[in-house]
């Protein structure tokens, strides 16, 4: 299954707010329903609940079905909580790191910067959005002038307290902001509200 490129509002109306996909906020159809309407709704099956959690994770991080399944398989083979390791793998992707640093408004826009070869990791150009960042990695945003003003305005508007503790943003060189990966992200700093166990359960027979 290919990556979704359709209207983003349609997705967040169905799956609720996804900060990585879009910074627009909408009230989901579930919340818009009146009390009488809710009482008439059929009971949602456990499969549908797990499917929705999986879809929220996939669309927020901009993954294909195959990519997410591969991440689940990697998480299952690692020591520790499969769900937390899965979230860790997704949060440590280069495109997500740029998003969490506040350099770009969404993960798709981070992916564009990376694909255009404007991002360096440890002084080497990386053009793979799924690149796995590690502690002590240094990420340099070497965007051309056309991007610099946009990035500068974005960083100025982004509150520093929104940057999670495992990351640090340095503006000592305004034209080349740098991000530092301090350590692996912990569960409390995950940017998406989700029950990762539902995702693991969804893939229990596939991974």
Swiss-Prot record:
Residues 92-156 form the S4 RNA-binding domain. GO terms for biological process: ribosomal small subunit biogenesis; translation. InterPro entries: Ribosomal_uS4, Ribosomal_uS4_bac-type, Ribosomal_uS4_CS, Ribosomal_uS4_N, S4_RNA-bd, S4_RNA-bd_sf. Disulfide bonds: none annotated. The keyword Ribonucleoprotein applies. It comes from the Eukaryota. PROSITE patterns: RIBOSOMAL_S4 (PS00632), S4 (PS50889). It is found in: Plastid, Chloroplast. Part of the 30S ribosomal subunit. Contacts protein S5. The interaction surface between S4 and S5 is involved in control of translational fidelity. Belongs to the universal ribosomal protein uS4 family. NCBIfam families: PRK05327.1 (NF003717), rpsD_bact (TIGR01017). This is Small ribosomal subunit protein uS4c. It comes from Equisetum sylvaticum (Wood horsetail). The gene is rps4.
């Amino acid at each position: 299954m290919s990556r979704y490129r359709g209207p983003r509002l349609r997705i967040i109306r169905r799956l609720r707010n996804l900060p990585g996909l879009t910074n627009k906020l909408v009230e989901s159809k579930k919340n818009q329903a009146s009390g009488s309407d809710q009482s008439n709704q059929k009971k949602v099956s456990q499969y549908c609940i797990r499917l929705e959690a999986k879809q929220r994770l996939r669309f927020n991080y901009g993954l294909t079905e195959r990519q997410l399944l591969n991440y689940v398989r990697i998480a299952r083979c690692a020591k520790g909580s499969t769900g937390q390791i899965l979230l860790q793998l997704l949060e440590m992707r280069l495109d997500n790191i740029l998003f969490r640093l506040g350099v770009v408004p969404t993960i798709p826009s981070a992916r564009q910067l990376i694909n255009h070869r404007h991002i360096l990791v440890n002084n080497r150009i990386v053009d793979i959005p799924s690149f796995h960042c590690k502690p002590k990695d240094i990420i340099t945003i070497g965007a051309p002038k056309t991007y610099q003003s946009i990035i500068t305005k974005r960083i100025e508007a982004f509150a520093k307290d929104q940057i999670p503790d495992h990351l640090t943003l340095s503006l000592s060189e305004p034209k080349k902001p740098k991000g530092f990966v301090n350590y692996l992200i912990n569960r409390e700093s995950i940017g998406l509200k989700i029950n990762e166990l539902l995702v693991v359960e969804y893939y229990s027979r596939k991974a």
